[in-house]
């Protein structure tokens, strides 16, 4: 099994090298996305590469271990839905940048069976990208029409109300406001 995973990883990395976009990679580095390796491959192209492989938990976990932007993205796209809960919090803790967190919330976190409850826990956690992922997960849930229960709503509104005084990271503040905009859409 390990040899098959190794072979798939080699095949994926070969495809990544062939699809490399040095200009995009350079621009991303200039914006602070300092991965060990960044091929600069656009998301639609990455999704195309992912479509050539079966969803596979072991392959996804293996790709996630590499500090390569595209491998982390492919890990998200290749993780089977039945395995989402097993990696969710570990991957939030290990997500290096909001770009990865954005795809993590859209593809995995917002599809967890208890996504709303988890997101409320995460917005209460200021470590790393947990709060950011919590707000972005809520944004996706609100877009789908998911409602919070009364206790969750109370916590959400209290944290969001004070976000500018309790949070220094602009990305988290913007994620909070983004989620609030979609929350308010549901209230109308």
Task: Describe each model-derived feature in a short phrase.
Residues 1-188:
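Alpha-helical scaffold domains
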């Amino acid at each position: 099994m390990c040899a098959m995973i190794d072979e798939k990883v080699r095949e994926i990395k070969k495809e990544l090298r062939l699809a490399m976009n040095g200009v995009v990679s350079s621009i991303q580095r200039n914006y602070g996305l300092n991965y060990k390796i960044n091929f600069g491959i656009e998301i639609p192209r990455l999704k195309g590469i992912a479509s050539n492989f079966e969803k596979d938990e072991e392959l996804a976990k293996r790709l996630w271990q590499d500090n390569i932007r595209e491998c982390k993205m492919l890990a998200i796209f290749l993780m089977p839905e039945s395995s989402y809960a097993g990696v969710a919090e570990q991957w939030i803790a290990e997500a290096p940048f909001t770009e990865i967190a954005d795809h993590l919330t859209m593809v995995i976190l917002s599809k967890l069976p208890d996504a709303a409850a988890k997101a409320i826990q995460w917005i209460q956690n200021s470590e790393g990208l947990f709060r950011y992922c919590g707000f972005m997960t809520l944004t996706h849930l609100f877009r789908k029409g998911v409602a919070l229960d009364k206790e969750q709503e109370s916590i959400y509104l209290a944290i969001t109300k004070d976000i500018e005084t309790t949070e220094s990271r602009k990305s988290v503040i913007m994620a909070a406001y983004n989620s609030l905009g979609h929350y308010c859409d549901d209230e109308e």
